[in-house]
Amino acid sequence: MSDITPIEIPPLPQNFHELNKLVRELGTGAETSTEDAKIFTQMAQIACNYLEHQPTLSDQEIKEIHASLIKSCVQKIIELTKEQPFPEVAKELRGISTRFALLVCLPIAYQNLNQIPQKSSFVDTLLFCTLNEQTPLSSAPNSVRSFVQKYNSDPKVRETYDTFKNKVISLRDSWVQGVLGETIFFRLAQEAELNPQFSSPQKDVGAQHVDYYITCNDKKIPVQVKSCQEGNAIPTIQKDFKGRLLIKVNASPNWLIPSQEEKLKQALFPSPETVNTFFALVNEQLSYYHNP
């Protein structure tokens, strides 16, 4: 299906699996024991050590990693849509989002945290919120509650933490939106029998940005996909002066929230009417397309 070798999001280190299991258990609202809080604090310290050893990345390196990771995840989700029911696809997307937040977004944002006092509690709290966004802090371990007291009483701590957390969430949501948008495009192109193919990694970023190729009437057409949170189920399509099709796809990271899963399901498993409309729009643009 592809001639590229995309970067994979590695599996979570074992300590993150333990941390994830613990915060999920804490999220049930059960009383947090002293031993649980101690383990959680230890996990946060391990996380700090893990984050501190991540290399500093340039903006260009981050863009290239993001682009390759998106392609890797699109491939995985496309395969899942062939083999698994929607609940399993949605579950995998949420897992991908969490791994990306922990293994990519946290280290990037963490580069500016060197001057933060009590770093363990700081990251402890962020990990709890990242892994368990729907859980009230009243269910958090003691180390998190202690930090929340500082957060409420110290404006500097509050400002720094909010900036850091917002950076992590912004990076994650922007990337997840890209994954969803490109997956939705790929599914539509598949259903419309346009034979979508991945471009090379070198064309994923930069001035000659090409995400995919589609084939219609024996012509190979370059495509750039842009994800946005506007519009409807039918992407907008426009041909640019370079001959690329610019396809704008409606996608939202909020669709990973269980209460909004129906929107995600409709996007990943499009109706015949949606597919036919998409195919007609592509053909309309290609009627003006001249292969150089």
Please give the residue ranges for each predicted region.
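A short acidic (Asp/Glu
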Residues: H209-D211, I234-P235
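Conserved catalytic cores of phosphodiester-cleaving nucleases, focusing on short active-site segments
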Residues: F185, A189, Y212-I214, I221-S227
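Catalytic cores of nucleic-acid endonucleases
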Residues: V225-Y289
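Acidic-basic catalytic patches of nuclease active cores, encompassing PD-(D/E)XK
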Residues: T163-F198
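Short basic alpha-helical hairpin corresponding to helix-turn-helix/winged-helix-like nucleic-acid-binding
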Residues: S139-K150, D154-S174
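Nuclease-adjacent, charged terminal/linker segments that flank catalytic cores
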Residues: M1-Q149
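Active-site metal-binding core of divalent-cation-utilizing nuclease and nuclease-like domains
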Residues: F198-Q208, T215-N217
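Intrinsic-disorder-driven secretion/translocation and chaperone-binding regions of pathogen effectors
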Residues: M1-I4, Y288-P292
